[in-house]
From Swiss-Prot:
Keyword Cell division: yes
Activation/inhibition comment: FtsK may regulate the catalytic switch between XerC and XerD in the heterotetrameric complex during the two steps of the recombination process.
Organism this protein belongs to: Serratia marcescens
Domain of life of the source: Bacteria
Domain called Tyr recombinase: residue spans: 113-292
Protein name in UniProt: Tyrosine recombinase XerC
Loss of function: phenotype: Defects result in partial SOS induction, inducing some overexpression of the nuclease NucA protein.
Cellular component, GO, one term: cytoplasm
Database matches in PANTHER family: PHAGE INTEGRASE-RELATED (PTHR30349), TYROSINE RECOMBINASE XERC (PTHR30349:SF81)
């Protein structure tokens, strides 16, 4: 494989340092940028671009066309061009480029499908776990919190004990772009957190992480995914259970009950309303009121 020219690589390395140090983006987002820009640099060399100052709109279209021919789907191609636009915007801000040649170049639109979710009956079936050991209590608490608050997997794993106000039934989470938000979690989730916290010390906690592995360390995302899938099979739920499906189900059930798109946007932590609109075929008190009135586990108060 031909080495990437330093005239392409060095500006990309500087941009990635900017994303890490100044923007403080998550490691996964940084990795996504790195992968997309590495692929683009290799394609750029194939079409004779060895310096970013020689990239023009015609060559950007060539990069998009080659990516498409390589089998990239519309959503992935849109992500690649978005990464390129962000990088070129940064080069403009650094005085390397006078204008962004990728501005205005769009990929063909692909239909956005409603994410698959679990219906309320299946969700109740999943959550009726036989609590025969502390790990089952931990898993029940994780399931209740994830579905009860619509958390991202990274937000669930990153939750610390100090982030939870049990009396108020609220959690503080750090979402995408290091944006913090306060969320209601409902009475049922609070109850199961209390059950879990009564057993947490059995795991020999090594820090303030809310959910622990057998070794007393913060549970990993891979472990959560594995445990959720296993519980789906054990509970006889027809749907394959993975963490993001619980978030989709939270959003769908909330919208079905409340019809309040803006409130659900805030609860999910979406920066743009259009992201939340895929679920449709303010102040915190308002969000809490919508939540209490609409979320199945808040209304039932099951334990």
């Amino acid at each position: 494989m031909t080495p990437i020219a330093p005239s392409l690589q060095q500006p990309v390395d500087a941009f990635l340092r900017y994303l890490k140090v100044e923007r403080q983006l998550s490691p996964l987002t940084q990795l996504s940028y790195s992968r997309q820009l590495t692929a683009l640099m290799r394609l750029a060399q194939e079409i004779g671009v060895t310096d970013w100052t020689t990239l023009d709109a015609a060559r950007v279209r060539m990069l998009a066309a080659r990516s498409k021919r390589a089998g990239l789907q519309s959503a992935s191609l849109a992500l690649r061009l978005s990464s390129l636009r962000s990088f070129l915007d940064w080069l403009v801000s650094q005085g390397v480029l006078h204008a962004n040649p990728a501005k205005g170049i769009r990929t063909p639109r692909s239909g956005r499908h409603l994410p698959k979710n679990i219906d309320v009956d299946e969700m109740n079936q999943l959550l009726e776990i036989d609590l025969n050991d502390p790990l089952a209590v931990r898993d029940r608490a994780m399931l209740e919190v994830m579905y009860g608050a619509g958390l991202r997997l990274s937000e669930l794993v990153g939750l610390d004990c100090r982030h939870v106000d049990m009396a108020a039934g609220e959690v503080w989470v750090m979402g995408k772009g290091s944006k913090e938000r306060k969320l209601p979690i409902g009475r049922t989730a609070v109850t199961w957190l209390e059950h879990w916290l009564a057993m947490r010390d059995l795991f020999g906690p090594q820090d303030d992480a809310m959910f622990l592995s057998n070794q007393g360390r913060r549970i990993s995302t891979r472990n959560v995914q594995k445990r959720f899938a296993e519980w789906g099979v054990k509970q006889g739920v027809n749907s394959h259970i993975h963490p993001h499906k619980l978030r989709h189900s939270f959003a769908t059930h909330m919208l079905e009950s409340s019809g309040d798109l803006r409130a659900v946007q805030e609860l999910l932590g979406h920066a743009n309303l259009t992201t939340t609109q895929i679920y449709t075929h303010l102040d915190f008190q308002h969000l809490a009121n919508v939540y209490d009135a609409a979320h199945p586990r808040a209304k039932r108060g099951k334990s």
